[in-house]
């Protein structure tokens, strides 16, 4: 590898350290042995116009040279790029990665190879690395200067203003005009100078990374973005230009697009001499197959364009790289060319799963000056804060979010110990990245076209392959807004913008465990094996003791939840005049008596357990090995508080009504939800007293089942069970109604584009991630099923971190059917509404069956009710368009997916770990039945967590609720240190090969993330397995309903 001429490479200017780089080979594959022999020097021109010389063996395949360039740049997402050069016929072609370099570049001393962008994704948020987006921005800058990216003056000025912001920083008119005089970005730049300066003034505070992102946001909407024109003629001899994009083949007349052939419509591509042929699929109502013919300058031009089409189709439409064709025994017909490298789907999965060593870097622009504070503003487009200071050091925790109070963390080469020093609480702000969706936009949707060289008679057919199972990754997803696998986000919501996700603590570097925090790491905590074994032997062995202990541990958590409203929320409200007095008098006077009562209840339970364990009054211990009398006494006391319990539903409705009518109160409540103590949505805490009654009922059922009828505690337990069952039955209807009401309001906060989600009569049924088939292929969408309508949304990179509603399908008159064979997509469903039809695909067969069952049930209910009521119809977005107009509008909205807000449209942070986001990142779904079952399956207590790199165990206080594990140092902590959403995880018992050698250990596993936890007894082990299994393995609807019916509220 040679030396750079004068200027450093993009990676070195960004401060990226040298490393071995990332190969484009899939995991488990080994690169072909590099041929020995004579070396050849190849000059590569980078996107910043610097040149680099590389020495490679002459007989080496093109992949060796391409990988050397990617390694030199430390480029992870190198598959979007390619090397182009003029061949001996002066035709600009792409370097074939499989052929020997010497057969392609015959005179390397006289050929300049260019490293450029080859595949332009439809959505720049799919580019997950800042370096990748920077290189794309350089490509846009280059295309502007060369006249490839044509646009109007306003768009050109806006693009240049973002480039100037990235290069020189915040607005300074004199500096701007001096810079524009020295740098020409477009041929007629002088006429645009005033507009450029005006636009640049609006970008104050925008970081270079944000400028790159906004540049791509503007560029991707231009018709000529990523378009490379190839001159041709149609059958009539009219001069046209052909181009290929992620969607298919495009036809231009000049710079105006006049036709487009989507991949789904193309059956076969071929060429014969200088004729390029496109064979289309027949229409639904016709068996006639249309074949289009275009004439190009010659066979070489024709074949070159055909190869480009083959590669674009494979990259954007296939799940995995097509397998090579077997060599013919006798005769060889047709082209042997095939796409080589990872598909976009594989690239997205590879980066998301953390299958690489994240390179931490900072931009080094000598003239950068920005007035924006990283603390005060959300950094919407950044996948990571470019510059990390000691005050914003970060800790990765699984796939990693961060500790807001991190003050210092040494690099692992120095020490593994990370420390936290107390500091002022930072203003919560989101640090998000424009990451791509789980399913690639453009993965295999319909049966793809065959590509063949008819002149030589061969076929290079490309068929969609089944996606490979996810490979285990060893790194953490740093710099991503994705849900942390075990996140140190003690707020349970948005993470501070001034905290970066450091890759230097990832397991790849053997530096720290994915389960690490200053309070949860190997060095900071003593080993607890001997101590815990001793304590466990002193505990009683009776199952009734552990049932009673469960009452104590869960009561502690319940008391903390009451304090969120009675103490923390009330204290915050008293400091600000943002809540009406009537609302205050409805909420707080009904929580304070409950808090006082349950404080005394907990003391009684703990005193009884102390006697049971023999820690005091050992001579009378036998008389106190029971809990039924305590439960009966206090449940009878609760009946006197029933009036307060009835008020909680009224308080919830009043709060949501007030929030709807007061922007100030809405912002106040949203800010409170971002505080550390509010680890769940605020309205969830208002329903906690109703949920707690069910837990008492379950505990008493277990006690009655455990004790024989002649046991001293049986009579009290049975009497207490009768009392609590009566209370639960009285509140049953209210609880069902309020859970639906609370869920609708929670979903409303996650959605934008619909204002009337919560109306009387609307019921939530299921939410989850599905892939929607469109002209761009399969694109990940979040679907929300209600009893009257099915909404689908996309997750754009917005400062609010919400999902944008893009379409709605009324259920009345809808039909649903499986359509895997028709579209060639696994787990595919076709939904046909009265005005619109869509095709969706689930991530698995079980997910498809859940959606099929729930949607069909909702359709049947809509049919029985003879269509939606007028009120339900009025709640839906207006839809008076004709079917054609509706389709066009839907297509338009598809082009607008994932669009980010500009820096002038920043919104307040939004909780980023809601169930909607978990389902999005785990590609799963959850129903209202699941939510109701989750309410019943809540548990608290001490667990031992195994250290990743040693045999030690660490004691943690763990709370399981809302499909998530929350971790505390002890039960006295006011807020969790970390959280682990469990949807998508598998729950198993460790095998002998894992060398755990301890009793009562269970294992949680998701992709490369593995955690071992240890319970104190057989009963607690079974209880943890039971409640966690309810979240990790969602049962079928029929099973869920039967379970639900067997547990009456």
UniProtKB/Swiss-Prot annotation:
Modified residue annotations for Phosphothreonine: 24, 887
Pfam families: FA (PF08736), FERM_C (PF09380), FERM_M (PF00373), FERM_N (PF09379), PH (PF00169), RhoGEF (PF00621)
Region of interest (Disordered), ranges: 1-37, 361-537, 866-908
Keywords: Cell membrane, Cell projection, Cytoplasm, Developmental protein, Guanine-nucleotide releasing factor, Membrane, Phosphoprotein, Repeat, Synapse, Synaptosome
Membrane topology: Peripheral membrane protein
Modified positions (Phosphoserine) in chain numbering: 20, 23, 340, 373, 389, 403, 427, 433, 437, 513, 517, 837, 876, 882, 893, 900, 903
Cell compartments where the protein resides: Cell membrane; Synapse; Synapse, Synaptosome; Cytoplasm, Cytosol
Main location: membrane
Gene Ontology terms: biological process: dendrite morphogenesis; enzyme-linked receptor protein signaling pathway; positive regulation of skeletal muscle acetylcholine-gated channel clustering; postsynaptic actin cytoskeleton organization; Rac protein signal transduction; regulation of presynapse assembly; retrograde trans-synaptic signaling by trans-synaptic protein complex; synapse assembly
Domain DH: 543-734
GO molecular function: cytoskeletal protein binding; guanyl-nucleotide exchange factor activity; small GTPase binding
Biased composition regions of type Polar residues, renumbered to the chain: 371-395, 402-412, 473-492, 499-514
Presence of the UniProt keyword DNA repair in the record: no
FERM domain mapped to chain residues: 40-320
Organs and tissues of expression: Detected in forbrain (at protein level).
Quaternary structure annotation from Swiss-Prot or TrEMBL: Interacts with CADM1. Interacts with RAC1.
Protein task: May play a role in semaphorin signaling. Functions as a guanine nucleotide exchange factor for RAC1. Plays a role in the assembly and disassembly of dendritic filopodia, the formation of dendritic spines, regulation of dendrite length and ultimately the formation of synapses.
Protein name in UniProt: FERM, ARHGEF and pleckstrin domain-containing protein 1
Protein species of origin: Rattus norvegicus (Rat)
């Amino acid at each position: 590898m040679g030396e750079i001429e004068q200027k450093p490479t993009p990676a070195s200017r960004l401060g990226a350290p040298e490393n071995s780089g990332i190969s484009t080979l899939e995991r488990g594959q080994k690169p072909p042995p590099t041929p020995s022999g004579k070396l050849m020097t190849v000059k590569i021109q980078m996107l910043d116009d610097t040149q680099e010389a590389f020495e490679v063996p002459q007989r080496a395949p093109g992949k060796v040279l391409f990988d050397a360039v990617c390694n030199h740049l430390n480029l992870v997402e190198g598959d979007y790029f390619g090397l182009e050069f003029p061949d001996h016929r002066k035709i600009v072609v792409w370097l074939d990665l499989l052929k020997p370099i010497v057969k392609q570049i015959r005179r390397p001393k006289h050929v300049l190879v260019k490293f450029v962008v080859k595949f332009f994704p439809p959505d720049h948020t799919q580019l997950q690395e800042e370096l990748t987006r920077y290189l794309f921005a350089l490509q846009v800058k280059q295309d502007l200067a060369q006249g490839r990216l044509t646009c109007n003056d306003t768009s050109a000025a806006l693009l240049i203003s973002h480039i100037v912001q990235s290069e020189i920083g915040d607005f300074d008119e004199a500096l701007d005009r001096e810079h524009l005089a020295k740098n020409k970005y477009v041929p007629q730049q002088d006429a645009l100078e005033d507009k450029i300066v005006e636009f640049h003034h609006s970008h104050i505070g925008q970081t270079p990374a944000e400028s790159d992102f906004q540049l791509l946001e503007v560029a991707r909407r231009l018709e000529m973005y990523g378009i490379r024109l190839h001159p041709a003629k149609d059958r009539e001899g009219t001069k046209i230009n052909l181009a290929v994009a992620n969607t298919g083949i495009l036809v231009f007349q000049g710079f105006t697009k006049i036709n487009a052939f989507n991949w789904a419509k193309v059956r076969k591509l071929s060429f014969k001499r200088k004729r390029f042929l496109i064979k289309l699929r027949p229409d639904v109502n016709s068996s006639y197959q249309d074949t289009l013919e275009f004439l190009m300058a010659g066979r070489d031009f024709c074949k070159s364009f055909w190869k480009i089409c083959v590669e674009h189709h494979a990259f954007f439409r296939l799940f995995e790289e097509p397998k090579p064709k077997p060599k013919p025994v006798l005769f060889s017909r047709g082209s042997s060319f095939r796409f080589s490298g990872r598909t976009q789907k594989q690239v997205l999965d590879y980066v998301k799963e953390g299958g690489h060593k994240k390179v931490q870097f900072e931009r080094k622009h000598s003239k950068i000056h920005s007035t924006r504070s990283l603390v005060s503003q959300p950094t919407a487009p950044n996948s990571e804060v470019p510059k990390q200071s000691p005050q914003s050091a970060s800790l990765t925790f699984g796939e990693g979010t961060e500790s807001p109070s991190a003050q210092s963390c040494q690099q692992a080469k120095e020490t593994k110990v990370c420390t936290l020093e107390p500091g002022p609480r930072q203003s919560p702000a989101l640090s998000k990245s424009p990451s791509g969706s789980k399913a690639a936009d453009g993965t295999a949707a319909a049966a793809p076209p065959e590509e063949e060289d008819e002149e030589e008679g061969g076929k290079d057919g490309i068929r969609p392959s089944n996606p490979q199972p996810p490979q285990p990754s060893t790194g953490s997803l740093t710099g991503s807004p994705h849900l942390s696998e075990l996140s140190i986000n003690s707020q349970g919501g948005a993470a501070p913008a001034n905290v970066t996700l450091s890759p230097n603590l990832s397991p790849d570097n053997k530096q720290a465990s994915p389960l690490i925090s200053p309070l949860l790491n190997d060095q900071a905590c003593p080993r607890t094996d001997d101590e815990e074994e001793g304590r466990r032997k002193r505990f009683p062995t009776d199952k009734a003791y552990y049932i009673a202990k469960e009452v104590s541990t869960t009561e502690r958590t319940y008391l903390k939840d009451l304090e969120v409203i009675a103490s923390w929320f009330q204290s915050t409200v008293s400091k600000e005049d943002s809540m009406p007095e009537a609302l205050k008098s409805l909420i707080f006077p009904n929580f304070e008596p409950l808090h006082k009562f349950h404080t005394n209840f907990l003391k009684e339970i703990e005193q009884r357990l102390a006697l049971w364990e023999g820690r005091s009054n050992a001579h009378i211990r036998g008389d106190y090995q029971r809990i039924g009398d305590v439960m009966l006494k206090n449940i009878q006391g609760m009946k006197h508080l029933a009036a307060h319990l009835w008020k909680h539903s009224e308080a919830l409705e009043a709060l949501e009504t007030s929030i709807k009518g007061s922007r100030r109160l809405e912002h106040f409540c949203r800010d409170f939800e971002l505080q550390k103590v509010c680890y769940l949505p605020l309205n969830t805490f208002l329903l906690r007293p109703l949920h707690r009654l069910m837990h008492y009922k379950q505990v008493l059922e277990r006690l009655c089942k455990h004790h024989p009828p002649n046991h001293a505690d049986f009579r009290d337990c049975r009497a207490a069970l009768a009392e609590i069952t009566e209370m639960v039955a009285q509140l049953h209807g209210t609880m069902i109604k309020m859970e639906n009401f609370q869920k609708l309001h929670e979903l409303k906060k996650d959605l934008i584009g619909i204002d009337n989600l919560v109306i009387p009569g609307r019921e939530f049924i299921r939410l989850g991630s599905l892939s929607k088939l469109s002209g761009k292929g399969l694109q990940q969408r979040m679907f929300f099923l209600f009893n009257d309508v099915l909404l689908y949304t996309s997750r754009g990179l917005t400062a609010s971190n919400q999902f944008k509603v893009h379409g709605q399908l009324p259920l009345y008159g809808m039909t649903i059917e499986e359509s895997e064979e028709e579209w060639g997509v696994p787990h595919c469903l076709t939904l046909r509404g009265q005005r619109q039809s869509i095709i969706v695909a689930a991530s698995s067969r079980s997910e498809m069956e859940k959606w099929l069952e729930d949607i069909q049930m909702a359709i049947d209910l809509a049919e029985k009710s003879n269509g939606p009521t007028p009120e339900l119809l009025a709640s839906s977005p207006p839809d008076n368009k004709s079917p054609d107009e509706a389709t066009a509008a839907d297509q338009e909205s598809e082009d607008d997916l994932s669009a980010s807000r500009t820096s002038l449209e920043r919104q307040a942070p939004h909780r980023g770990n809601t169930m909607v986001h978990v389902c999005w990142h785990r590609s799963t779904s959850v129903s209202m039945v699941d939510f109701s079952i989750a309410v019943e399956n809540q548990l608290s207590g001490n667990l031992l967590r195994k250290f990743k790199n040693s045999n030690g165990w660490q004691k943690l206080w763990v709370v399981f609720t809302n499909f998530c594990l929350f971790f505390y140092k002890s039960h006295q902590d006011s807020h969790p240190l970390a959280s682990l959403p469990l949807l998508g995880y598998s729950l198993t018992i460790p095998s002998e090969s894992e060398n755990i050698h301890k009793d009562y250990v269970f294992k949680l596993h998701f992709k490369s993330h593995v955690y071992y936890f240890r319970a104190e007894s057989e009963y607690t082990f079974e209880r943890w397995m039971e409640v966690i299994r309810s979240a990790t393995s969602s049962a079928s609807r029929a099973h869920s309903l039967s379970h639900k019916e067997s547990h009456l509220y």
